[in-house]
A protein has these predicted regions:
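Structured, acidic catalytic/metal-binding patches in enzyme active sites
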Residues: 25-270
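Boundary at the C-terminal end of the N-terminal hydrophobic targeting segment
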Residues: 18-22
């Protein structure tokens, strides 16, 4: 069940009998999911918490999801109550890049880093059939923008996907991770980060090499287009289901996420 939630955010604490009695379980949906045109707004609780225990040790698991309704605000009362009494907060798994103090010296070299090498256009670097699918989506969600045709597939598809979500009333910037860190900081809970960060020793050299390199980002581009073509309605249903805590609906929907393909394009580049 938990495979449907990315990332998993864990709240680790000692067991308290009263909590075991108040563990929240979402009620199953009465019927299968149907196309939804209206997204939920206002404060919503999300799916609640899952309890994992062994002896006196208890771990509360919170399943995050993205994108969510742009006008929804996560109501964090239940999670705050558990996290405030926790011994440790495990951050969601992630990958990142750190440039250190040399980042400032690399700023002048960042100009044009999103563009394809040697002045190539998008139509020159992606398969013709995929580019033909890109054009109507670009017209619908982005509009006139010649500059984006010079960008690498990964960056162009990211802009397209972001605009597509906004058009559907969704947002990938959920603010949930930030809220969890704020709660942990407020109650002085130990934070254990589970992400992996790649340190760049020479940012200027890396940027120069990156601008000349060819990325393995066609899968990212293709999956972004596929998800906008086939999964947008399902994303709206999942977003509403997460906001309402309707786990049965979330479990019933399958989807091909673009996230892994796009993350791989970055982490397997010259960086």
């Amino acid at each position: 069940m938990l495979r449907h939630f990315v990332p998993l955010l864990c709240l680790c604490l000692l067991a308290v009998p009263a909590w075991a009695q108040s563990d929240t379980v979402a009620e199953p949906a009465a019927a299968g999911p149907a196309p939804e045109k209206i997204l939920v707004v206002g404060q919503r609780p999300g799916p609640g918490l899952w309890k994992i225990s062994k002896g006196e040790h208890v771990m509360w698991v919170f399943g995050a999801y993205s994108p969510l309704p742009a006008k929804m605000e996560w109501r964090a009362h239940e999670v705050e109550a558990k996290l405030s009494q926790s011994q440790e907060f495990l951050s969601p798994p992630s990958t990142g890049i750190a440039a250190g103090y040399g980042a400032m010296t690399a700023l002048p070299f960042m100009v044009g880093f999103k563009n394809n090498p040697d002045g190539a256009m998008l139509k020159d670097v992606v398969p013709a059939d995929v580019y033909a699918r890109w054009l109507p989506l670009k017209a619908k969600y982005i509009g006139e923008n010649d500059g984006i045709e010079r960008e690498r597939p990964m960056f162009a598809s990211d802009e397209l996907f972001r605009k597509g979500l906004a058009h559907a009333g969704l947002s990938g910037n959920t603010g949930i991770d930030k809220k969890l860190y704020e709660i942990a900081t407020k109650y002085k809970v130990k934070v254990t980060r589970t992400g992996v960060t790649t340190k760049i020793e020479s940012p200027v050299k890396t940027i120069r090499a990156f601008k000349k390199s060819t990325l393995n980002d066609l899968a990212c581009f293709s999956r972004s287009i596929e998800q906008l073509e086939t999964d947008l309605d399902a994303m709206r249903i999942r977003a509403n289901a997460w906001a309402k805590g309707d786990i049965a609906v979330i479990e019933s929907l399958k989807f091909a996420d673009r996230g892994d393909a796009c993350a791989d394009a970055v982490m397997t580049s010259v960086v």
